[in-house]
Design a protein with these regions (language model features):
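Conserved SAM-binding loop
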Residues: 18, 72, 267
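Short, solvent-exposed amphipathic alpha-helical segments in soluble enzyme
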Residues: 88, 282-285, 442-446
Length: 465
């Protein structure tokens, strides 16, 4: 039988004896992919350290050995890069895979659902906990609901199927109580028969990791019927997790930048304001940078941009500054021209205009007042154009109106870090009162813990030992 051959190939591709949960997941996949009903989907849930990435990699290699088309996707650039490395096959962001820019609209930000010309392809989406199903206000992409559009795109292709992989204990999308793409009833609501499985057995090699041992303890608090209490983090006997006092942070961060590299070190905070404080302190006291933007600065894009890179640069993408020039003040804002490289896109180089004011504010992007002032100022520059349509088109193509909105990327909120992994991760939870000890906080802490691959540092954190 085809399913028997597929199962054998998956086991061979895995290269080691699977756990009971992994074996069950592979069996479920065989039933899913060989079902005569093509309106089927599969959800594979799994916590950190349970080996779901190994199962996904085995599925990809087995399907490719049978000459079946497999398309890998993830919500963010860094998540796609990690998925690609784990699966040994290229991966795209969901947005880049399913959307195409509208033509002849004069609006550079209009993206419609693309055409899926594939036949009998398997689409696998990692980090699916991040996928929202609520329409976003003023959304530039498709219907505005990423999950709606993803399902529509996949099943518009003849015989195509969707597999969603994620961790239900992680933070759900902003404004959601749980992750819709990992919720069976939500996916069934699209008229799909859903196969589901969960890898819940922590792999033996994970027991020696303080990161995964503590993350597992934190995750299990979500399933415990007892009232929530402060997680009792254990450090003793683990080399990969440690507490850091505030007075030692500068020296420790400097060491991480030297050992792991700036692109593999991150500070995770509870708020944009805390991230801003850390970013300012790191630039001044660790990196010794005085100018607002310098060569070598790591940035994070905070608003989708369609002007400088095809097809677009997404909110959450990271950039490294290679060169800064022509700093200037216009329209009550400050701008600079910069040469950037995008590490999540194989170091692709971009020349762009950046608005500098977002770097030093607590706001997540330009405020409505700043945006309106910028629009009015740029529009006035094109008063010589006789027709309103011409003036609006000129504004939408203007380099200052389309300037990249960025934040420093040394410290970010957990939602911004989600989907990514770093060798060295520093967690600052800030002040935490008894009222703030909620399931949402536990998910935040679990998500932050599981961003680290080598070393985790807890800043001013009360631990068990």
């Amino acid at each position: 039988m085809i399913s028997d051959e597929l199962l054998d190939r998956m086991r061979q591709a895995m290269g080691f004896e699977p756990t009971a949960g992994q074996a069950a997941a592979m069996n479920t996949f065989c039933h899913f992919i060989t079902d005569d009903d093509r309106r089927t989907a599969m959800i594979m849930r799994g916590a950190a350290g349970t080996g779901k990435s190994s199962v996904a990699g085995a599925i990809v290699r087995a399907m490719q050995s049978l000459r079946r088309k497999v398309v890998l996707m993830a919500p963010t650039g860094r998540a796609a890069k990690i998925f690609s490395l784990n699966a040994g096959s290229p991966a795209l962001t969901i947005h880049r895979a399913i959307y195409r820019q509208k033509t002849f609209t004069g609006d550079m930000s209009g993206f419609k659902l693309g055409f899926n010309g594939l036949h009998d392809a398997l689409f696998i989406v990692d980090e699916a906990s991040m996928i929202a199903d609520r329409p976003m206000p003023d959304a530039a992409f498709g219907s505005g609901s990423l999950l709606d559009d993803l399902v529509s795109y996949v099943y518009s292709g003849e015989g195509c199927r969707l597999m969603l992989i994620g961790d239900k204990a992680q933070l759900p999308p902003v404004g959601e109580e749980k992750s819709p793409a990992l919720t069976t009833s939500t996916v069934e609501g699209y008229g799909l028969t859903v196969y589901e499985c969960e890898t819940d057995e922590v792999l033996r090699q994970a027991y020696g990791s303080g990161i995964l041992s503590n993350a597992t303890m934190i995750r299990r608090m979500l399933d415990d019927a007892a009232p929530l209490s402060m997680p009792r983090i254990r450090l003793k006997g683990f080399a990969d997790i440690q507490a850091v006092a505030g007075e030692d942070l500068i020296e420790q961060l400097s060491d991480s930048y030297s050992r792991a590299g700036m692109d593999e070190t991150i500070v995770i905070t509870r708020s944009n304001k805390r991230a801003g404080i850390y970013n300012a302190g790191i630039r001044a006291r660790v990196l010794d940078r005085e100018d607002i933007l310098s060569r070598g600065d790591m940035l994070m894009i905070v608003k989708n941009n369609y002007r400088w890179f095809e097809p677009f640069i997404a909110n959450g993408d990271r950039a490294e500054v290679r060169r800064v020039r022509n700093v200037r003040e216009l329209y009550g804002l400050h701008f600079a021209d910069a040469e950037l490289s995008l590490p999540d896109y194989d170091g692709a180089e971009v020349k762009a205009t950046i608005v500098l004011d977002v770097l030093s504010t607590d706001a997540p992007a330009l405020t409505r007042e700043q945006q309106d002032r910028l629009f009015g100022g740029v529009l006035a520059d094109y008063d010589d154009l006789p027709r309103k349509q011409e003036r609006m088109k000129a504004v939408k193509e203007d380099k200052h109106y389309n300037a990249l909105q960025v934040k420093y990327a040394y410290a970010v909120t957990c939602h911004k870090a989600q989907g990514g992994q770093w060798a060295h991760v520093y967690i600052d939870q800030g002040y935490l009162s008894a009222e703030m000890l909620t399931p949402s906080y536990i998910r935040w802490l679990y998500t932050a813990f599981t961003r680290a691959t080598e070393k985790l540092f807890l800043i001013n954190y009360k631990t068990q030992d």
